[in-house]
Amino acid sequence: VSFPNSSFVQGSTVFHDYGFQVDYRNKDCDIIYVSPAHMTKWGDIMPVSRRLELVNYSAAHGSLVIEDDFENEFVYLQKPTPSLFGLAGGQNVVYLGTFSRLLLPSIRVSFMVLPSSLRELYAPKASFYNQTASKAEQIALCQFIRDGHLVSQTRKLRRLYAQKLKSLSCAVREVFETDCQIKTGAAGTSLSLTIPCTVNGKALKEAARAEGMRLEILKETSSDITLVLSCSSIPVKDFLPACQLLKNISDNCCSFSASSDILS
């Protein structure tokens, strides 16, 4: 099984636990796992040309594509892109989706759309697998979709997260001014932030944890560090103080590191 990178630890771990050999960016694998609407942590989207290339490659080489369409609902800066499943005509692609981001996180209702070749293999075994989602929740969700509420809910949340991401970007820029680099994609609920930092990522994370802040580090060098900031679960009013706290933590860590170097 090939993943685009090593960031999706939960997914690669599941396959590894079931005896699959996990690799990264290897097109010669039998299974290719991709998230076209979430190619990077900051919301880059796989273009149609690349999707068609992947679909044609999988068809020609007999490989199976697993399309995890995570956050495909939150595309702000371009028109929605056709899914790999749709472009492939339902062949050689398994489509995975979830409603947890659109509805309550506690409603863990996900779904999988199989190509016809796999449906025939799955049908005789379907009764051997227990459904973990509540029947009541499934029925309520079905009615919710049937009545058209999911469409309006998606539009509402798309506007909400687009505005929140813009507000977060403005808060970061206000606090760090020109001393930072911000990346946002066409979709998603996160941005990447690169700031000057001479202390190692582990020390920065520990300092942040002591202040009640959890950091996700994408990359670090001897002179700077790149973080992922999410706007999904934090109120807009907390963006500015959170950014200021992050800057204080970073400045204090770097100052302490510089002082230690001088003393040594």
Predicted regions and their residues:
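Conserved PLP-anchoring active-site segment centered on the Schiff-base-forming lysine
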Residues: 1-10
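Active-site phosphate-binding strand-loop segment of PLP-dependent enzymes
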Residues: 9, 15-76
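Active-site PLP attachment segment
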Residues: 85-121
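Conserved PLP-binding active-site segment of the aspartate aminotransferase-like
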Residues: 114, 192-197, 214-249
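Active-site C-terminal subdomain of aminotransferase-like
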Residues: 118-137
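Structural signature of PLP-dependent enzymes
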Residues: 123-129, 147-169
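Conserved glycine-rich beta-strand-loop-beta hairpin in the small C-terminal domain of fold type I
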Residues: 159-169, 180-194, 224
